[in-house]
Amino acid sequence: MDAQNKEVDALVQKITGLHAAIAKLPSLSPSPDVDALFTDLVTACVPPSPVDVTKLGSEAQEMREGLIRLCSEAEGKLEAHYSDMLAAFDNPLDHLGMFPYYSNYINLSKLEYELLARYVPGGIARPAVAFIGSGPLPFSSYVLAARHLPDAMFDNYDLCSAANDRASKLFRADKDVGARMSFHTADVADLTRELAAYDVVFLAALVGMAAEDKAKVIPHLGAHMADGAALVVRSAQARGFLYPIVDPQDIGRGGFEVLAVCHPDDDVVNSVIIAHKSKDVHANERPNGRGGQYRGAVPVVSPPCRFGEMVADVTHKREEFTNAEVAF
């Protein structure tokens, strides 16, 4: 067995062990045991690795799918927990740094904005934005609105009304960004005419966790978004044990032209795919045997690896705010 195969096997074994430990937890709500296991999981998954999760055996694939579901549930509970903590402050937006992964959202949103500005024809100066799968902590919308798109209006969609109620409370004291944020409880499958109003649509990584679900969402967006509108899809090519992977060719088949694909090798966990709805691209047409167009990955320089800093920062904040929770 060569060194690369040994590395892959060692990682899969480690992830399998963590999955087994996480699956045995009585609850996925934030606690020292939950925090420690998921910190170990992120620590194992984020560094660059030769593993290709699409080529794993059936047993490992089943484990991975179960792990993604556990990650989704734990992420939802973690975000709800911190959303409630933040809502206790007079101005919650002043305390977003409490969340241990906030820096990841800052870096991911910056990357997405830079990719949009670089690759979307005509730019995105004053867009109407939809974020699908915004959750109880809509950090991405906030960072984009506050730092990159000061004139944009954001409509945030989530299936969970409780998540939207939590999210809206975070903006109650802010007269700028708060005035540009709206929250809607809806299934993306039920959005039709609404989608045509947006210049940019963001699709969160956990919308359509199963491959077949994601395969339904993207053609639906392609059928109802306006010509020329941009689509930002979060995937996880290099971190496929944490989030579902989206094939850029599936986006092409869904009625879009793929403009850029970026797989960061630093502390940004998600991959990013930038596409746009072209009047010459329709989901039901299949030029060259495909629906839509896929031009291949556009090389994007990733920022320098700050993985060690990220792990240290997350560990420090978890310890700091575990103690602080007594006050709430």
Curated annotation (Swiss-Prot):
<dbReference type="GO" id="GO:0030410">
    <property type="term" value="F:nicotianamine synthase activity"/>
</dbReference>
<keyword id="KW-0949">S-adenosyl-L-methionine</keyword>
<dbReference type="InterPro" id="IPR029063">
    <property type="entry name" value="SAM-dependent_MTases_sf"/>
</dbReference>
<dbReference type="Pfam" id="PF03059">
    <property type="entry name" value="NAS"/>
</dbReference>
<keyword id="KW-0808">Transferase</keyword>
<dbReference type="InterPro" id="IPR004298">
    <property type="entry name" value="Nicotian_synth"/>
</dbReference>
<protein>
    <recommendedName>
        <fullName>Probable nicotianamine synthase 6</fullName>
        <ecNumber>2.5.1.43</ecNumber>
    </recommendedName>
</protein>
<dbReference type="GO" id="GO:0030418">
    <property type="term" value="P:nicotianamine biosynthetic process"/>
</dbReference>
<comment type="function">
    <text>Synthesizes nicotianamine, a polyamine that is the first intermediate in the synthesis of the phytosiderophores of the mugineic acid type found in gramineae which serves as a sensor for the physiological iron status within the plant, and/or might be involved in the transport of iron.</text>
</comment>
<comment type="similarity">
    <text>Belongs to the nicotianamine synthase (NAS)-like family.</text>
</comment>
